[in-house]
């Protein structure tokens, strides 16, 4: 689909001049050079994003939660009933799930999007982008057609861009779908080249005696569908799921606007791997929130070259980690914009990164 290809070629480059200017500004603040550590690095990263116009700041915040069922659930790779996807999606509309509570704490809006829930009728209160009632069973068929994947990517990209036009400057991604760590593991295994046994974890508390079956299912899915690891759309269509496609769409949409997107857990790492295969230019816009407790998390993050800011031993998904990390983004912006400057206080510090204003 030519429209998608055109969009992928228009993602703006990071502004290195703005980043250098931000570095000089931060070095001149009331503190020893480098003493605010990763907050400084984060502020400089934000300054380089064209959508923020060279000044790290946060306007409106949004967490986009992609909800979908998966045909591979039939293979016994999850212990939760498939109906839990629809039930939890409804609970999200009531604001009672983990991501809703954490997003409210962070001052972010949660957008609950149905991209493939297996119900006869759309669920009231959800944003309806449903492609089908669940993806195909990747152990016996592709998850979806390439055309379906490309159309959903474009729909989500357009939705994300519209939110940006309405003042959202910080995006978070999340997902909801029983059995979705299985296609996520298949994506990670395909793109990183690691064996399924190295990346398949217990997901939502799968008993360890069922893990061998899950590993076998992932291996069968890859062998049967033969996804091309260099083609992110192909990987998503063959061994992914509608929720994973949707997450990738948010990343591409935010990056196309020059804006940051907070990753969540393992599902978002998998989607990021696929999105970066489509457009490596999006990588500087990705901010890892927390280290997922899922087995293949480190492998995926290492391939992406990302180091999470938090390690809370979380594996809920939903966008909970992205929401939790939003105040860290705001803190980086606050130190950049609100701290005083050394020159204004007639303080001269030696260029020693270990020096301390109080010593």
Curated annotation (Swiss-Prot):
Gene Ontology biological process: cobalamin biosynthetic process
**Catalysed reactions listed for this entry:** 5,6-dimethylbenzimidazole + nicotinate beta-D-ribonucleotide = alpha-ribazole 5'-phosphate + nicotinate + H(+)
What is the enzyme's main class?
Answer: transferase
- Does the record carry Glycosyltransferase as a key word? yes
Pfam name, any one: DBI_PRT
Q: Which UniProt keywords apply?
A: Cobalamin biosynthesis, Glycosyltransferase, Transferase
Which family is annotated?
Answer: Belongs to the CobT family.
Summarizing the function annotation, the protein's role is:
Catalyzes the synthesis of alpha-ribazole-5'-phosphate from nicotinate mononucleotide (NAMN) and 5,6-dimethylbenzimidazole (DMB).
Q: NCBIfam families this protein is in?
A: cobT_DBIPRT (TIGR03160), PRK00105.1 (NF000996)
The name of this protein is: Nicotinate-nucleotide--dimethylbenzimidazole phosphoribosyltransferase
Q: Upper taxonomic classification of the species?
A: Bacteria, Pseudomonadati, Pseudomonadota, Gammaproteobacteria, Enterobacterales
Gene it is expressed from: cobT
């Amino acid at each position: 689909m030519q429209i998608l290809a055109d969009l992928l070629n228009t993602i703006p480059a990071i502004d290195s001049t703005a980043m250098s200017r931000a570095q000089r500004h931060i070095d001149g603040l009331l503190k020893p050079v480098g003493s605010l550590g990763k907050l400084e690095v984060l502020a400089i990263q934000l300054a380089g994003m064209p959508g923020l116009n060279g000044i790290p700041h946060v306007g409106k915040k949004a967490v986009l939660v992609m909800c979908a069922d998966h045909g591979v659930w039939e293979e016994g790779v999850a212990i939760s009933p498939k109906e839990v996807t629809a039930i939890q999606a409804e609970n999200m509309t009531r604001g009672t799930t983990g991501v809703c509570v954490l997003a409210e704490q962070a001052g972010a809006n949660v957008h609950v999007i149905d991209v493939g829930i297996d119900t006869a009728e759309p669920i009231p209160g959800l944003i309806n982008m449903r492609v089908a009632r669940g993806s195909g069973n990747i152990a016996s068929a592709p998850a979806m057609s390439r055309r379906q994947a490309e159309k959903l990517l474009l729909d989500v990209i357009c939705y994300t861009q519209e939110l940006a036009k309405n003042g959202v400057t910080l995006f978070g991604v999340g997902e909801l779908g029983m059995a979705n760590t299985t296609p996520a593991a298949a994506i990670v295994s395909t793109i990183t080249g690691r064996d399924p046994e190295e990346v398949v974890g217990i997901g939502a508390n799968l008993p360890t005696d069922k893990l061998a079956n899950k590993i076998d299912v992932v291996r069968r899915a890859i062998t049967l569908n033969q996804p091309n690891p260099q083609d992110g759309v192909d990987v998503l269509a063959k061994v992914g799921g509608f929720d994973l496609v949707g997450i990738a769409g948010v990343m591409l949409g935010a990056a196309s606007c020059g804006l940051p997107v907070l990753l969540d857990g393992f599902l978002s790492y998998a989607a990021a791997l696929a999105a970066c295969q489509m457009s490596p230019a999006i990588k500087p816009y990705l901010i890892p929130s927390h280290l997922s407790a899922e087995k293949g998390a480190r492998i995926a993050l290492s391939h992406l070259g990302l180091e999470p800011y938090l390690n809370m031993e979380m594996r809920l998904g939903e966008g909970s980690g992205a929401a939790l990390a939003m105040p860290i983004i705001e803190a980086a912006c606050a130190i950049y914009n609100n701290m005083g400057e050394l020159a204004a206080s007639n303080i001269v510090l030696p260029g020693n990164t270990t020096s301390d204003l109080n010593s």
